[in-house]
Amino acid sequence: MGARNSVLRGKKADELEKVRLRPGGKKKYRLKHIVWAANELDKFGLAESLLESKEGCQKILRVLDPLVPTGSENLKSLFNTVCVIWCLHAEEKVKDTEEAKKLAQRHLVAETGTAEKMPNTSRPTAPPSGKRGNYPVQQAGGNYVHVPLSPRTLNAWVKLVEEKKFGAEVVPGFQALSEGCTPYDINQMLNCVGDHQAAMQIIREIINEEAADWDSQHPIPGPLPAGQLRDPRGSDIAGTTSTVDEQIQWMYRPQNPVPVGNIYRRWIQIGLQKCVRKYNPTNILDIKQGPKEPFQSYVDRFYKSLRAEQTDPAVKNWMTQTLLIQNANPDCKLVLKGLGMNPTLEEMLTACQGVGGPGQKARLMAEALKEAMGPSPIPFAAAQQRKAIRYWNCGKEGHSARQCRAPRRQGCWKCGKPGHIMANCPERQAGFLGLGPRGKKPRNFPVTQAPQGLIPTAPPADPAAELLERYMQQGRKQREQRERPYKEVTEDLLHLEQRETPHREETEDLLHLNSLFGKDQ
């Protein structure tokens, strides 16, 4: 523990706490990182005391540098921490880990020549594709030697076929696992597949067709001199009539090499692509987004189906620009059309994030519920004509009952008289149905009152109704005349006598009884 505490002291410990773990990050190095690095050095058989000096850190970096490209995350973190400690010992001011890493690597290459002094055994054994010495064929002592496929590679291939079941991922997976393989190795991979024999038969038929085509395009030149290697036939490329040594010689001979491994891989890829179409019959035109499906899930299904399509890149580009937007649901389509012409996939994913999901549905339902529960909008004209609310107690506008300072009104709220309430007010007005007959409830139709000063525009009355009204008036007059006393009748007759002078005497005789008794009365 003492060695760990003595790695950085004083000013160096203060400088360590100023170095950031990541560029632009907030976290910085602490002493606990030094303790962790010392514990990790024990796993590589390195002493903790090497961290106390600049030369010791250089020795650690020489050991760890070749392992960094293929190392784990802990190894890379240890390498970065040692680079920071080396910069502190070298009194190099750095701001973050990346800057310290670049400075330490530059110093190793310039001064110690670490890259040139690395042993060949620590370098990758598999060179890039297309070059000689590709795995599993390696060069040893000037001769090419075949190395069988590892069980891990075969297991990865079998697991890929079982999990994906000849999906679109099988073709690139086969290309990666069969890099640099001979026809013998490729046949081993195909023989490891136990299930899906129908797909294997499809691949065999494709191989036979391609082999026959190869034989027709490359006829036998004729008899060859003794000891000269013959040219491969279609069956030789398929590995049925050729040995591993012949396949290696065809692939790496100085004159006219024939890459039988790559040719056979191409035939297998054609068969796998046909199997992908058979096992995935869904056409890309049928890939449409569901009404509640997230846009990201729809894009994944679309590109998975597009990957299985065996068409030109130009056609795939057209499908991406047109079908991706055309087959989206109405909600996402409305958003995508607002992005303009030819939007990028990142823009589309960002714009449609959350569209069609539960969050958007809940938001739409909340907005609809808010509109339904809220007050209906008042037209502008009605809002202008609407009167202000008047408080019933004081009769003033602009305040409510809680803000009113006037004393509370006593008695009826309608007429203001004491002794009764508004429900029993005798001066109450009729509603829109009017007052009912004889104190009963009003009828079921509104009472309309014609406003004064207006000329009615109704059609003229019925003549029969007018005649009936006239007869009723005459009968009323006759009834009144019958009820009048006799004196009033006499006065009427006297008035009638004064009007008619020629008959005055006759009328007088009728009024007096002289006509009957004469002068005897």
UniProtKB/Swiss-Prot annotation:
Keywords: AIDS, Capsid protein, Host cell membrane, Host cytoplasm, Host endosome, Host membrane, Host nucleus, Host-virus interaction, Lipoprotein, Membrane, Metal-binding, Myristate, Phosphoprotein, Repeat, RNA-binding, Viral budding, Viral budding via the host ESCRT complexes, Viral nucleoprotein, Viral release from host cell, Virion, Zinc, Zinc-finger. The keyword Zinc applies. Gene3D superfamilies: 1.10.1200.30, Human Immunodeficiency Virus Type 1 Capsid Protein, Immunodeficiency lentiviruses, gag gene matrix protein p17, Single helix bin, Zinc finger, CCHC-type. Residues 191-228 are annotated as: Interaction with host PPIA/CYPA and NUP153. Coiled coil: none annotated. Residues 7-31 are annotated as: Interaction with Gp41. Residues 14-33 are annotated as: Interaction with membrane phosphatidylinositol 4,5-bisphosphate and RNA. This is Gag polyprotein. Late-budding domains (L domains) are short sequence motifs essential for viral particle budding. They recruit proteins of the host ESCRT machinery (Endosomal Sorting Complex Required for Transport) or ESCRT-associated proteins. p6-gag contains one L domains: a PTAP/PSAP motif, which interacts with the UEV domain of TSG101. Residues 12-19 are annotated as: Interaction with host AP3D1. InterPro entries: Gag_p24_C (IPR045345), Lentvrl_matrix_N (IPR000071), Matrix_HIV/RSV_N (IPR012344), Primate_lentivir_Gag_pol-like (IPR050195), Retrov_capsid_C (IPR008916), Retrov_capsid_N (IPR008919), Retrovr_matrix (IPR010999), Znf_CCHC (IPR001878). A zinc finger (CCHC-type) spans 389-406, 410-427.
